[in-house]
């Protein structure tokens, strides 16, 4: 009887002024408003998002995905990479395309839908070769510079472009390594 009375009291009582106006824990929760786009997905362990199980270069798939992300409130998109293993996901003149030549590139599909939805995109400038790009290698460094110029020419004035992302990351252990700083500054 006591438990029943307490539950009835708890359910029928009005919230206090503090309960209705002050939610310190929920005030700290911020929505996710950005996400990564990973066209060159390498992790074959994940059977649901592994490109072996669907056409990861389909422009309609990416247009729909950007539409969905926009509806969820996502404002920022960051391309992880726009090329991998010397194949591009954009109309490159430097390398073979990773998508059929008779259709729109995945990068163009994403950029155009993002512009339509007023989203902001950080364009990746890699990978010159693959995810292990070593910018100390003169050939990879030159390829990276060529890609950066090509991407700037193709997308530098695109309405969805918000910034650039160099996907050659290094450890902050506790500081960036000297070769990482030198490589980025050289680019």
Language model: regions and residue ranges:
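Glycan-processing catalytic domains of CAZymes
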Residues: 19-187
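Bacterial N-terminal signal peptides
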Residues: 1-8
């Amino acid at each position: 009887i006591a438990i029943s009375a307490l539950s009835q009291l708890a359910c029928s009582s009005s919230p206090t002024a503090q309960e209705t106006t002050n939610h310190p824990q929920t005030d700290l929760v911020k929505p996710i408003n950005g996400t990564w786009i990973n066209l060159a997905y390498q992790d074959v362990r994940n059977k649901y998002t592994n490109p072996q199980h669907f056409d990861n270069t389909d422009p309609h798939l990416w247009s729909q995905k950007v539409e969905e992300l926009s509806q969820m409130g996502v404002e920022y998109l960051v391309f992880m990479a726009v090329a991998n293993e010397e194949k591009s996901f954009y109309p490159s003149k430097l390398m073979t395309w990773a998508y059929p030549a008779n259709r729109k590139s995945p990068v163009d599909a994403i950029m155009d839908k993002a512009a339509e939805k007023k989203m902001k995109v950080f364009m990746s400038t890699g990978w010159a070769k693959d995810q292990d790009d070593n910018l100390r290698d003169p050939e990879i460094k030159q390829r990276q510079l060529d890609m950066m110029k090509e991407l700037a020419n193709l997308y530098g004035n695109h309405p969805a472009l918000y910034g650039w992302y160099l996907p050659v990351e290094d450890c902050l252990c506790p500081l960036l390594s000297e070769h990482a700083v030198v490589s980025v500054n050289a680019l």
